[in-house]
Regions:
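ER/Golgi luminal nucleotide-sugar-dependent glycosyltransferases, focusing on the catalytic module
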Residues: 2-324
Length: 324
């Protein structure tokens, strides 16, 4: 006999509904249990630059005015800049970094200036105001990049220049530019009372230089010089004694002008200070030491010169020369 064919039957609707509900319930319970478990999520690694900033700030935080370190390095930096060279230098030479952020919002770990207008100019002034009562014996103001075209001796790397700097020259002179080459800046870089017609028509800061000079130095127009000249640019060493020759309120006044002036923009603020740093720190309005003598005083490179002359480096009375 032929067997009967077995017919397929669909499950009853009620059975299907119960099965779906069971599946949904099981899924929800599983998700709840999974989400209740603590997730082993590793935090994102700290950016390399932030790691360097943190390590530099740890060195800064060790500083007191009784610190064994005599030398502070002051600079402005953005979060994108690689300061690995500075970290290595400070560790190798026992110097203290004072790094001011120019970012908005401020970069982590760095010191915050009173204003970011003028970039390194206001970082330098903020440092003096912040640490006026506990300055290291020597302060060297530098730019943040590892290579600087301003460095005219020992190559472009600031880390190659600093070890050769004679701190005895800073003792003797109070202010020492890290650069010796006269061009640009010497013999004259600004003629305050003789702006060009183009400067006047464009409302360039040069057209207002007498007014700016009077404000920065709290003097009358009769004290504004006819000419200003100095070795470029914004890298120099200053002794504690020379910084303290001005009261703190002088530096605060300069900072206030930088933050509030409507005569120029941030770039112009920085430009102004590059023209007058030597005046801020007690040098003549035109300060252009002979190139060979500057090289001898600042770095001990005294000859003999091609002419056969051998120079004598400046010395501070009763002081022992050191290098950074």
């Amino acid at each position: 006999m032929m067997s009967k064919r077995r017919l397929f039957r669909w499950p009853a609707p009620r059975t299907v509904c119960l099965g779906c509900l069971a599946l949904v319930f099981t899924t929800l319970v599983t998700m709840f249990l999974y989400m209740s478990e603590p997730l082993d999520i590793q935090p994102d690694p700290e950016p390399v630059n932030n790691q360097i900033f943190r390590q530099l700030s740890e060195i800064t935080n060790t500083y007191t005015n009784a610190s064994a370190s005599e030398v502070g390095l002051v600079l402005a930096a953005t979060q994108k800049e690689d300061l690995g060279w500075l970290l290595n230098y400070c560790r190798d030479h026992g110097t203290i970094p004072f790094i001011y952020t120019t970012d908005t919002p401020p970069a982590p770990y760095l010191l915050v200036p009173a204003t970011t207008r003028g970039r390194e100019a206001t970082a330098y002034l903020s440092y003096i105001v912040d640490f006026y009562d506990q300055l290291p014996k020597y302060t060297i103001f530098i730019h943040s990049n590892v290579d600087q075209w301003h460095n005219d001796l020992f190559g472009p790397r600031t880390s190659s220049v600093l070890p050769h700097l004679r701190l005895e020259a800073v003792d003797a002179q109070g202010y020492v530019n890290l650069r010796c080459e006269h061009n640009p800046g010497c013999p004259t870089s600004v003629n305050p009372w003789e702006p060009t017609q183009i400067d006047i028509e464009k409302d360039d800061i040069r057209a207002f230089f007498p007014q700016v000079y009077e404000t920065l130095f709290n003097v009358g127009p009769e004290k504004v010089p006819q000419h200003i000249g100095n070795v470029c640019c914004g890298q120099f060493a200053v002794s504690r004694e020379r910084i303290l020759q001005r009261p703190r309120r002088d530096y605060e006044r300069m900072l206030k002008w930088a933050a509030e002036t409507e005569l120029t923009d941030s770039f112009g603020v920085g430009w102004v200070f590059e023209k007058v740093w030597h005046v801020v720190f007690g040098m003549e309005d035109i300060y252009c030491p002979r190139y060979e003598q500057c090289r001898c005083d600042a770095y001990g490179w005294c000859g003999p010169l091609p002419s056969g002359e051998t120079l004598q480096a400046v010395r501070a009375p009763r002081s022992k020369g050191k290098s950074t």
